[in-house]
Amino acid sequence: MSKKGKKYIEAFSKVDKNKFYNIEDAILLLKEIKFAKFDETIDISINLNLKKNHTVRDTIVLPNQFMKPKRILVFAKGDRADEARAFGATYVGDDDLINKIKSGWDEFDVVVATPDMMKDVGRLGPILGKRGLMPNPKTQTVTNNLKDAINSLKKGRTEFRANKNGVISFSFGKSSMDNEKIKENYEEFVKEVVKKRPSDLKGAFIDSIYISSTMGPSIKVNFVWR
């Protein structure tokens, strides 16, 4: 705590660490203790009760978007490439883009590939994998249905996953957003996480939920989903 700034310590002192706040009060408090001068991102941290063999991973489109548009790169050839351009992909190509990325180019936010391109795209594993951008059927980024894939990404479809410690960290709003819209995003996200409960899990799935702003302290949120 001694390494934190005066403003953080003051904000921290206003949070009851032993209290479970309902989401409405948590959002109000988060905004009340805000001290940063920029529009902070609001994050959620969900601690899950998982076994080593459990995987929690999916994608979601939140009801209220807040992030800047993503630069979508699509690996495709022929008619599929033409489709990708028509549907609004930022970059479309095959070997030309593969070589460009190998040379260090990284001005894109998400990568989609048609199944027939994956053998070639696989050569970029060390590069794309490091950024968490390797196309994967589980995240709907390996597909022949480029229209749906691109449209959903334009609407803000984003991947979430639990790390090796069973923690999901995800951004779901901005401090400038209306409180009700922040709440709607929170509820939609938690609902989607609950759907990923492993079928063989015994006991509670969610251990705890916290929300915080970029510069602020964590606030423990009460929840009814198990």
UniProtKB/Swiss-Prot annotation:
Biological processes, Gene Ontology terms: regulation of translation; translation
Q: Could you identify this protein by its name?
A: Large ribosomal subunit protein uL1
The UniProt function text for this chain reads: Binds directly to 23S rRNA. The L1 stalk is quite mobile in the ribosome, and is involved in E site tRNA release. Protein L1 is also a translational repressor protein, it controls the translation of the L11 operon by binding to its mRNA.
A family per Pfam: Ribosomal_L1
- Gene Ontology MF annotations: rRNA binding; structural constituent of ribosome; tRNA binding
Return the similarity comment. Belongs to the universal ribosomal protein uL1 family.
Q: Which gene encodes it?
A: rplA
Q: Which UniProt keywords apply?
A: Repressor, Ribonucleoprotein, Ribosomal protein, RNA-binding, rRNA-binding, Translation regulation, tRNA-binding
GO cellular component assignments = large ribosomal subunit
* Description of how the protein assembles with itself and partners: Part of the 50S ribosomal subunit.
Keyword Iron present in the record's keywords: the answer is no
Please indicate which superkingdom the organism of origin belongs to.
Answer: Bacteria
The record, for CDD domains, names: Ribosomal_L1 (cd00403)
